């Protein structure tokens, strides 16, 4: 049973520790009833990553009556016809009660030549596990998942680089990482 409605609790999950930690703080309250939001791609967890600010509750933060172990993250050959990269991991309910976990998959580009977020959420999967139960989760990524918009070429492009795949329970609770070269 929930003690607080999910709608009410969601508000608190996105709260900064300090008002000055918010992206719009430097431009608030605007001028002549006009408020400009200048963070561009760097909204939410992307802003906090770039500014190296730890929010009160990170994007994806949640509570559970049990614990989960993430292990064996590894790159695997993609199975989907449009997939260009894939990886899998094992997740285990290491607690004493049934639980659900949202496994979040983030992608980083090592030494990117373009201005982009430090990491981007690309996939997620909710798993339900009995105590001691394990499941294998596979994430497949398409070219579009790894692309950025090139203003110069007016098209989506994949930057040739080392791509770091991270999985975790929230934007700052990263449990495992692995990498592959794409390009």
Feature map (PLM): residue ranges:
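A generic helix-loop boundary/linker signal
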Residues: 1-2, 35, 153
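Intrinsically disordered, low-complexity Ser/Thr/Gly-rich stretches
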Residues: 20, 42, 51-183
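Extracytosolic ligand-binding ectodomains
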Residues: 29-39
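Internal, active-site/partner-interface "lid" segment
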Residues: 13-31
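Single conserved hydrophobic/aromatic residue that forms the stacking wall/gate
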Residues: 1-12
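Extended hydrophobic/Leu-rich segments
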Residues: 10-15, 40
């Amino acid at each position: 049973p929930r003690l607080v409605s999910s709608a009410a609790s969601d508000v608190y999950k996105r709260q900064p520790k300090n008002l000055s930690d918010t992206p719009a703080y430097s431009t608030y309250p605007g001028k002549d009833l006009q408020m400009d939001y200048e963070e561009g791609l760097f909204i939410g967890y992307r802003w906090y990553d770039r500014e190296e600010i730890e929010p009160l509750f990170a994007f994806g933060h949640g509570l559970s009556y049990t614990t989960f172990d993430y292990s064996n993250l590894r790159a695997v050959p993609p199975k989907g016809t449009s997939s260009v990269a894939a990886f899998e991991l094992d997740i285990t309910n290491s607690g004493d009660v049934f639980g659900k976990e949202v496994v979040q998959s983030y992608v980083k580009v090592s030494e990117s030549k373009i201005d982009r977020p430090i990491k981007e959420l690309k996939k997620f999967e909710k798993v339900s596990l009995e105590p001691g139960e394990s499941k294998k989760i596979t994430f497949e990524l398409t070219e579009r998942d790894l692309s950025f918009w090139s203003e110069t070429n007016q098209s989506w492009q994949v930057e040739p680089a080392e791509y770091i795949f991270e999985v975790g329970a929230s934007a700052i609770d990263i449990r495992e990482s692995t990498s592959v070269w794409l390009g």
